[in-house]
Amino acid sequence: MTKDELKALGWDRCDVVIVSGDAYVDHPSFGVAIIGRVLEKAGFRVGIIAQPDVTDKTSFSRLGEPRLCFCVTSGNVDSMVNNYTANKRLRSDDDYSPGNRPHMRPDRAVTVYCNKIRETYKTIPIITGGLEASLRRFAHYDYWDDKVRQSILADAPADMIVYGMGEKTIVDVVGRLKNGERIADITDIRGTTYKTRKIGDLSDFIELPDFKAVSTDKRAFAEAFKTFYDEQDPYYGHTLVQRHPKTIIVQNPPALPLTTAEMDAIYDLPYTRYPHPSYKEDIPALRTVRFSITSHRGCFGGCAFCAITAHQGRMIQSRSQESILREIRALTKLPEFKGTISDIGGPTADMYMLGCSKRSTQGMCRDKLCLYPEPCPNLNKDHSRLITLLNEVRKVPGVKNVFIGSGIRYDLAMQDEQYLYHICRQNVSGQLKVAPEHVSRNVTDAMCKPSIEAYDKFVSKYREINKELGKEQYIIPYFISAHPGCTLKDAIQLAEYVRDMGYYVEQVQDFTPTPSTLSTCMYYTGYNPYTGQEVYVPKSVEERRMYRALLQYKNPENYDLVKKALISANRKDLIGYGQNCLIKPVRPAIYKKPGRRKP
């Protein structure tokens, strides 16, 4: 956005300027678009500075000083995850930048952006939000520095974090700024974290071990994490406090979950679903979500490696069927729409309108998970409203196909055979994404995932249903390598399972320790904070590379690593010419595509 655009709107200045590490796309899958539209709906003038040049001071002042505040986010993804691979190598592309160009955002973008803003504007309130700020709101282990870092509020000259999804919270905060309150006095809004020098007025709070303790004592870190994790419930979560060397971090309880009407109001806003017209190149991240629909937020799966618990929460917040149908009718009018809805879902597709009766009054259970180790008997597993929704979407003129691109939680789907039949009949595009993640019980327990036996039962039922329907449809399983709890023996067990599946696995993700997840706590401390038991953690680069190579043992480029792993584990029985062998005794030739000769 430029000052010329402000003039075209008849504005002399903005009320709020949002600074983002992503290119600007006016689509509800992009957080900046949602926050901007919500603030606009509330009557505020909102400007957006997307991917500012941090070497040019004027990049942050091109819209002038906003009347109320700057809002700062790294974008949809943590900037360190966006910039580096799981093995800390610099990425060569960026899906959230025009033309897939890398290096359009700095490392630790939120901190850098806040510093740049403060260089020019000494007193303007700076509010941070999004994944990077939310998940770094307390002292946290940083994989890229391999150390415990302070809260992002202690490192950056920001005044507040609006953590979680944040729509209601940011409107409340900006509204109070408009009414003349100082940002330092706004300390009572749910879903915010702020810094202070004293906590004398606070009551009913829990104090976490301080920064010095958690940065020098791994047991203290695990204790702090467990308390933090357990208190992320909007109904029983307490205010949390953590002392840092020069400040005190205070997190208010999480925001209450949005009602269906509130969800509808957010997604009914007039998103264009296009990038800003100034871009001459495509934004790759838009391709996969252009014709997708968000039906709900939150996930009660509780996977240890996933940040959704700390960001969106475990409670499902669903839109109404009418709101979803309105969005789809609007979507069909876009000239690029060819009749296919690529996805209707959320973090996982099959939790729409699900939950249990106690959650809306008492919160989620403290001492157990909804799906691990088995689905809870109190959980509503009836997918009938989702089935009705999928059927109604197919009736919308112009819609030819409705697919589930976000994947399903297979152990939940197994609780409702009618749903499984329905998606196999109408909503699978030929391949269904599911995530068993691993086969070893050591690892699936550390992940809080069901056993591989549950996955095998699902595969059997899926094949049975497709055979009955006369369809040839497949499963794309997703696996994680080098997760805490995984030993070399476990990695080989997974490789043997992949061998027995009979087809090559491409969907392999190296475990990346991201802030504020249970898995990251185990990675750093070597302990499970809930049991106190030690957890084996594969940390060396070579070991992590071996574990991944074992999963893709058919790739000739992985031969040396696979052979080394098998010899190290005393599994030479898997080297040979037998049908159960992973590799042959002789290294295969590596095919290289012929390159173009230099002129």
UniProtKB/Swiss-Prot annotation:
InterPro entries: Elp3/MiaA/NifB-like_rSAM, rSAM, rSAM_horseshoe, UPF0313, UPF0313_C, UPF0313_N. It holds the Pfam family DUF3362. Keywords: 4Fe-4S, Iron, Iron-sulfur, Metal-binding, S-adenosyl-L-methionine. Its cofactor is [4Fe-4S] cluster. Transmembrane segments: none annotated. Binds 1 [4Fe-4S] cluster. The cluster is coordinated with 3 cysteines and an exchangeable S-adenosyl-L-methionine. Coiled coil: none annotated. [4Fe-4S] cluster binds at C299, C303, C306. Belongs to the UPF0313 family. This is UPF0313 protein UNCMA_01890.
